[in-house]
Amino acid sequence: MADRFNMSGDFRGAIINIKSTLTNVQQSIGDIPSDDETARKELESLIGQLSEALQKVPAEHQEQAQAVAETAKVLVDTAKAEKPNKTMLQISGEGLKQAAQNLAGVMPTVLTIAGQIVMTVAKLTGTM
């Protein structure tokens, strides 16, 4: 059973933070050492789709949405290393899927997109 959090307050800034985080992630995808331009473009598209989906998450789930954005950032940052650490990639990928799972009830597409991001990063880094 998933944890439930009751949150109140002004979450308008959270959407901006999510968009900013994922815009930075999109811009850094070019730094992943890979010759697979198709996978690189696919990852950029998936991050864009994730950003759009997370901006539609209800206010009471913004904390979970922010966790998804931050975990996607960690995954891409890990993949950018000259020799990406396969264990860290696996942990970051699982973390992204788990963070997305927390939103599956309100935004199921986030879980699908997160899984596709993990697979695409694995293709780019040769860890598949």
Where are these regions (language model features)?
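Short amphipathic alpha-helical segments that predominantly mediate membrane engagement
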Residues: 1-9, 19-103, 119-128
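Mature extracytoplasmic or organellar-lumen-exposed domains after removal of signal/transit peptides
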Residues: 110, 114-117
